[in-house]
Amino acid sequence: MGQKINPLGFRLGITKNHNSHWFAKPNNYSEFLQEDRKVRNCIDNYVHRHVKNSSNYGGVARVEIQRKTDLILVEIHTGFPALLVESHGQGIEQIRKDVQQNLLDSKIRRVHVTSTEIAKPYGEPNILAEYIAIQLENRVAFRRTIRKAIELAKETDIKGIKIQIAGRLNGTEIARVEWAREGRVPLQTLRAQIDYCYYPAQTIYGVLGIKIWIFRDEE
């Protein structure tokens, strides 16, 4: 049953922390939750417009949001900050303007956006899944792509990884699921630090679903 539940939500409060750090009254909770979704959508849209292309990817691992009375703090964890900052000279400032314009409406609140570099980006499942998606969209064989992704991940300090791809692999008529694992991935162990992500790849044959589980360590 370990694969039937999201590994991140399963460990929330044990080995995983929330990506949004704020408190709200019951009347404001849904509003703040929707605003957080809009912030993340603004960042995704900027990355797809200005950074990501057929040979390049955004490299955003996660976005953390903190709130104060009149201030929203947004921290972007990225493996390749140069792409995000230097793509149009003022990338972070443009993201801040987009968020301010699309999010705050007429409310008087300030937005502060920062970026944090991840030392070993291929140890992050979101970045690794984005790499796999680009390879599949460029018609690289899925088995070769999985092998290369595992090699990149093994260069970081992880103890195990599992990659699963589902869909019309290599353009076959019947969809199927293929997966590969290296090392241990103990999904049932709550103290195990497991990172997980799902990422869709848009190919000419349809959508391929990519799932990655990364086992870092045990607490």
Swiss-Prot record:
Transmembrane segments: none
Domain KH type-2 span(s) in chain numbering: 47-119
GO cellular component: chloroplast; cytosolic small ribosomal subunit
GO molecular function: rRNA binding; structural constituent of ribosome
A Pfam family the protein falls into: Ribosomal_S3_C
Annotated signal peptide: none
Keyword annotations of the record: Chloroplast, Plastid, Ribonucleoprotein, Ribosomal protein, RNA-binding, rRNA-binding
Database matches in InterPro entries: KH_dom-like_a/b, KH_dom_type_2, KH_sf_prok-type, Ribosomal_S3_C_sf, Ribosomal_uS3_bac-typ, Ribosomal_uS3_C, Ribosomal_uS3_CS
Superkingdom, natural source: Eukaryota
GO biological process per UniProt: translation
Assembly information from the UniProt record: Part of the 30S ribosomal subunit.
Record's protein name: Small ribosomal subunit protein uS3c
